[in-house]
């Protein structure tokens, strides 16, 4: 497989640390509000990556954190505490907010056919791991205590800005004018590992530590949770492009300082979803959720298809017109597949060129658009219906669009025997030029919401959606 690596900004052959096994880590949600569909685009594409790696024969372990403490509204240790902000907004405790929005996130994932990671770890479960990692960084001289907080010292590194095109001026992005700069830092790029002097008097979640009662910084969470579950070597780290700096930059800094060797080989970043106002963001107030799309009559899998129609390394612009186009394409695709007959066995030799086409697409930096083209190639191909259904079922292990579900439901529906009998009677009536009987049967089928199509390959039928 060829995969674009943000660390180096080139396409590279994917070679995991241990042959046949892939350790994967995903930056999970900060659970202070609903995920918007821009957030979910990232998780959809990460889901496709995981499923394609499994499809390609790898044994994949995917770990994801849940940030339920420590994430401030600027990724650079400034601004409001997001969890505290959510709790105040809804007059609930931080843990009540965290549970509600964690459940809501996974409900959205379920609707979008996003597989739950093998390990899901809330940050609040790992305080001991955070304290241990910070202690080691202090012992090694990579961290210092100032003003009651523990900071990572970026001046100890030969190269802090590992993703390129970044500098300390970028740390100001997202910081509100009313937020004072942290004068305890020795260098502007330094970041907090542990807060004991919280700027928030009402901070709910605090723990004992060697440096006083406090709570972890956001960046230490992902490093410690990944090391806890994936060990010292990580193959792929995933996230949105806005996580690359400073969050992922800080993860690399502290993880490699702690471990004493290179940590993660490949960095997979998904670009933004934009709307008419620019990048979709919760900070703008109103934002689109899966539930909102459902309330407008859209199947969540239409949004998944919309995402798969574009490459993950390209910004994607959302509009209802483009979603409508995806809905039309999805409806036509499902109807076409539902007309295929499952009778017979697939021809595995005939299937090979189509499998190769799909692998060539997904294996080249996860080109989901060409992967969808492979589905249409199958439908147009001069192969049996059984072979087509086999191939589409295989592809859908990665695409996860429920492409064969309507056909499977049709096969399991007892009413199908009646439909098949009526169609046979209609065919016989037409052969005998008994148009009255043929029309009567057609009307009955219409009442049953059955659509009949006369094609060159014979009669095809499906239920109306």
Regions picked out by a protein language model, each given a short descriptive name:
Residues 8, 17-113, 454-461:
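N-terminal, positively charged nucleic-acid-binding surface of large information/translation enzymes
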Residues 92-96, 106-132, 142, 244, ...:
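Non-catalytic interaction-recognition regions
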Residues 279-282, 286-465:
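Structural preference for alpha-helix termini/caps and helix-kink/transition segments
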């Amino acid at each position: 497989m060829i995969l674009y690596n943000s660390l180096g900004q080139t396409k590279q052959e994917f070679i995991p640390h241990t042959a046949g096994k892939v350790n994967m880590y995903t930056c999970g949600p900060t659970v202070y509000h609903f995920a918007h569909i821009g957030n979910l685009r990232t998780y959809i594409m990460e889901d496709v990556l995981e499923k394609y790696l499994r499809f390609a024969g790898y044994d994949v372990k995917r770990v994801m954190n849940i940030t339920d403490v420590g994430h401030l509204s600027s990724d650079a240790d400034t601004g409001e505490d997001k969890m505290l902000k959510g709790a105040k907004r809804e007059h609930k405790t931080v843990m009540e907010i965290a549970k509600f929005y964690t459940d809501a996130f996974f409900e959205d994932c379920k609707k979008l056919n996003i597989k739950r990671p093998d390990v899901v770890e809330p940050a609040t479960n790992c305080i001991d791991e955070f304290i241990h990692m910070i202690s080691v960084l202090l012992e090694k001289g990579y961290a210092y205590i100032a003003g009651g907080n523990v900071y990572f010292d970026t001046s100890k590194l030969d190269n802090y800005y590992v993703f390129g095109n970044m500098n300390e001026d970028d740390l100001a992005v997202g910081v509100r004018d009313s937020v004072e700069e942290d004068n305890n830092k020795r260098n502007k790029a330094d970041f907090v590992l542990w807060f004991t002097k919280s700027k928030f008097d009402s901070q709910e979640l605090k723990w004992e530590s060697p440096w006083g009662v406090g709570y972890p910084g956001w960046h230490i969470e992902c490093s410690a949770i990944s090391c806890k579950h994936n060990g010292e070597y990580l193959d792929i780290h995933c996230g949105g492009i806005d996580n690359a700096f400073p969050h992922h930059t800080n993860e690399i800094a502290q993880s490699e300082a702690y471990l004493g060797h290179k940590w993660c080989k490949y960095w997979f970043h998904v670009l933004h979803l934009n709307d008419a106002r620019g990048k979709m963001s919760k900070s703008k107030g109103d934002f689109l959720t899966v539930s909102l799309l459902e309330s407008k009559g859209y199947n969540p899998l239409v949004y998944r298809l919309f995402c798969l129609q574009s490459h993950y390394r390209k910004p994607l612009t959302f509009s209802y017109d483009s979603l409508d186009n995806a809905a039309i394409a999805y409806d036509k695709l499902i109807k076409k597949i539902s007309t295929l007959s499952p009778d017979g066995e697939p021809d595995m030799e005939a299937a090979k060129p189509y499998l190769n086409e799909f692998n060539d697409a997904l294996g080249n930096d996860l080109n989901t658009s060409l992967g969808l083209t492979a589905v249409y190639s199958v439908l147009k191909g001069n192969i049996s219906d059984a072979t087509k259904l086999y191939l589409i079922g295989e592809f859908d292990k990665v695409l996860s669009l429920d492409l064969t579900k309507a056909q499977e439901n049709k096969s399991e529906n007892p009413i199908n025997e009646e439909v098949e009998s009526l169609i046979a009677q209609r065919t016989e009536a037409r052969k005998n030029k008994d148009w009255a009987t043929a029309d009567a049967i057609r009307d009955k089928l219409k009442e049953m919401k059955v659509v009949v199509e006369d094609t060159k390959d014979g009669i095809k039928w499906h239920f109306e959606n």
